[in-house]
Amino acid sequence: MKALIVCASRSHGNTRRVADRIAEALDAEVVAPEAVDPSVVGNYDVVGFGSGIYYMMVDARLRKLIRRLPAVDHHIKAFTFFTSGAREIPLLGYNRSVRQQLEQKGFEVIGSFSCRGFDAVGPFGFVGGINRGRPNDDDLDRAAAFAGRLRKRVVGSQAAS
């Protein structure tokens, strides 16, 4: 199984920590969106797309990469992962939006993971931030378990074809 993880992580490195834990389980390389050549994404069996959430939005670098991706004709599997200071607001739906964009490109999105991350941006900075210490060991263990389930699903689908 050949895996790639695209991770847009800024501020405190929360999302990168999650990406690294998922990468261990998938034996994957973690790269920033601007380091990805869109034309090679089709060479992977599974691609993870992850971002910190900034003001309820996915990082602009990841959004730009997804827009630039060519259509994939053989349904490469994909997954998403996010860290955020607050819960997703259903009306804004950043996870749904990314999923739909990937599906429009031909990816089969097989899962999503999210957890809280330390957030000291905007008004949270005035109170020293929220979710200090997150993602914590429990969050990272959940990320590893998520990746284990992804691995089984991808390898299982390869064996079936």
Regions found by a protein language model. Name each.
Residues 3-6, 10, 14-17, 21-31, ...:
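FMN-binding flavodoxin-like domain, especially the glycine-rich phosphate-binding loop
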Residues 33-36:
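Conserved SAM/SAH-binding loop
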